[in-house]
Amino acid sequence: MKTLNRVSVIGAGAWGTALAGVAARAGREVTLYARDAATAAAISATRDNPRLPGIPLDRSIVVTHDLAAAGRADIIVIAVPAQNSRTAVAALAPHLAAGTPVIASAKGIEHGTRRFMTEVIEEAAPQTVPAILSGPSFADDVARGLPTAVTLAAKDEAMAVALVHALGSAAFRPYHTTDLRGVEIGGAAKNVLAIAAGIVVGKQLGASAQAALTTRGFSELVRLGLACGARSETLSGLSGLGDLILTCSSPQSRNFSLGIALGRGESAPRGKLSEGAFTAPALLELAAANGVEMPVANAVAAILAGRLTIDAAIDNLLTRPFRAEG
């Protein structure tokens, strides 16, 4: 396998900028691609990204608006929202050499197709090798170099190991797996479930209810994952349970914050993307296709679509028939 030294991150938002810093700290030659030329020029000149205030960009990172230049890399990291990933990968595809690993870092399922992000990469750039990076990680923590552990998956174990060694450091510790589906289901489902956890907090239903909701939500995540062929150890690992715990308990999570606002009867926080809101309908379609019941995720989707009030959703969940745990 060739040396994986040049890393390009596509997307100069908070997460993309944080991941560019990860690659730089790992000793790689890093390019950060911004779609907007003015944004690229400003970040390059000031070494500051307004999306990550107070965290200077490493001087070694090259910021560009040139997609062809960004494509000349040994590793590509796609750091755009899930629903924009296909467009980003398709635009980049003509500039990518055969066999280039392309790592998805968005947590979601594509609308309309029910495709996971590695499937989107496989379709939009079939000459490349899809991979996925996911786990309990906030952009601000990662950008500051605070200790973080994540999961990195690729179909080929040797490739997964090579990517881990290319991006890992003392502060950013990826664990490798070949279980793409498990990693992707964990990341997608936890965003939807975090909205429910936020609603519990916003409605002031108590810490006991929050713990119960998170645990029952995890049961839904596991049922769906196993039905889709995921491994149980992946679902109970960093990209599943680990990410769920973080996202269901921290106001840094946009999905959790959205739920808190909804629970308080407020409008959604402005200017903050909640992947869970976009993923909820696709997640339920996937669950239905696999014969999996997900009452908590279903309640979230119904609330977001305006089909059910929060109070009615809570009543529905609390009056479900008693059953054995599992």
UniProtKB/Swiss-Prot annotation:
It comes from the Bacteria. The keyword Acyltransferase does not apply. GO terms for molecular function: glycerol-3-phosphate dehydrogenase [NAD(P)+] activity; NAD binding. It catalyses: sn-glycerol 3-phosphate + NAD(+) = dihydroxyacetone phosphate + NADH + H(+); sn-glycerol 3-phosphate + NADP(+) = dihydroxyacetone phosphate + NADPH + H(+). Pathway: Membrane lipid metabolism; glycerophospholipid metabolism. It comes from Nitrobacter hamburgensis (strain DSM 10229 / NCIMB 13809 / X14). NADPH binds at residues 15, 35, 107, 139, 254, 273, 275. It is found in: Cytoplasm. Coiled coil: none annotated. InterPro entries: 6-PGluconate_DH-like_C_sf, 6PGD_dom2, G3P_DH_NAD-dep, G3P_DH_NAD-dep_C, G3P_DH_NAD-dep_N, NAD(P)-bd_dom_sf. This is Glycerol-3-phosphate dehydrogenase [NAD(P)+]. Its main location: cytoplasm. It is an enzyme of class 1 (oxidoreductase). Catalyzes the reduction of the glycolytic intermediate dihydroxyacetone phosphate (DHAP) to sn-glycerol 3-phosphate (G3P), the key precursor for phospholipid synthesis. NCBIfam families: PRK00094.1-2, PRK00094.1-4. Keywords: Cytoplasm, Lipid biosynthesis, Lipid metabolism, NAD, NADP, Nucleotide-binding, Oxidoreductase, Phospholipid biosynthesis, Phospholipid metabolism.
